[in-house]
């Protein structure tokens, strides 16, 4: 793992102290992160990695709507929190960073939980983000894998689903990752399987 997004509705579950500790642990492991911090300046900083001389920057934003992600503390000049997924904020961040790196990707924590499809507002915003100059979009939050589409010769992953997640529901979403060997998961319940879609007649 080289880069993670901290812009999500659980990064502040243990308050500012918890966020600070998360950042410290990631620093120790050498994992770059973006989307959250002790103030708005930190949250808007990209996580940058270089492969074969190519610089790749990541910016991360968390949705602000109560009906999708619930309460999320957003960072201000003097307050810790998340990077807010407002159009103006995203556009300005892309314009500020686009010319400094070879590629710029956007993490978005958005969407309706347990839905297999993006909302119209998601597709509209995604199109704008690519027009503003981002090279691709990687989404999460829905606990379901949502469509991958190509637009402007760039890719939009609306939601990657669950990589590794302790779900409390009986009909658990399938994980994105299927371990065949390696990690000992004997003490951590998880489920394989296909997505379950309830159909009412």
Predicted features along the sequence, with ranges:
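Short acidic, glycine-rich surface-loop motifs adjacent to enzyme active sites
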Residues: 7-9, 94-117
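Generic structural signal for well-ordered alpha-helices
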Residues: 23, 46, 90-95, 126, ...
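Active-site environment of divalent metal-dependent phosphoester hydrolases
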Residues: 11-23, 40-45, 64-69, 111-116, ...
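Acidic/histidine-rich helix-loop elements
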Residues: 63-88, 112-115, 166-192
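Conserved beta-sheet core of the metallophosphoesterase superfamily
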Residues: 2-3, 120-200
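Structural recognition of the beta-strand scaffold that forms the well-ordered cores
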Residues: 2-7, 13, 32-35, 56-60, ...
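Binuclear metal-dependent hydrolase catalytic cores centered on His/Asp/Glu-rich metal-binding motifs
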Residues: 50-104, 124
